[in-house]
Amino acid sequence: MADTTGRIPLWLIGTLTGIPVIGSIGIFFYGSYSGLGSSL
C-alpha cells in the first residue's frame, strides 16, 4: 500500500485533475446551449 508512486496515488491525482476539466467543459457547453457562450 505504501509502495505507490510517491506519496499520492495516481488515481487520486487523476480524479482531482479530471473533475475540474470535466466541470469546465460542462460549463462551456451549458453556456453555449443557453446562449452565454455564443459570444466567445
From Swiss-Prot:
Predominant localisation class: plastid
Domain of life: Eukaryota
UniProt key word Cell membrane: no
InterPro entries per the UniProt record, alphabetical: PSII_PsbJ, PSII_PsbJ_sf
Signal peptide: none
Membrane-topology annotation of the record: Single-pass membrane protein
GO biological process: photosynthesis
HAMAP family, A to Z: PSII_PsbJ
Reported function: One of the components of the core complex of photosystem II (PSII). PSII is a light-driven water:plastoquinone oxidoreductase that uses light energy to abstract electrons from H(2)O, generating O(2) and a proton gradient subsequently used for ATP formation. It consists of a core antenna complex that captures photons, and an electron transfer chain that converts photonic excitation into a charge separation.
Family to which this protein belongs: Belongs to the PsbJ family.
PANTHER family given in the database record: PHOTOSYSTEM II REACTION CENTER PROTEIN J
Subunit note: PSII is composed of 1 copy each of membrane proteins PsbA, PsbB, PsbC, PsbD, PsbE, PsbF, PsbH, PsbI, PsbJ, PsbK, PsbL, PsbM, PsbT, PsbX, PsbY, PsbZ, Psb30/Ycf12, at least 3 peripheral proteins of the oxygen-evolving complex and a large number of cofactors. It forms dimeric complexes.
Name this protein carries in UniProt: Photosystem II reaction center protein J
Organism classification: Eukaryota, Viridiplantae, Streptophyta, Embryophyta, Tracheophyta
Gene: psbJ
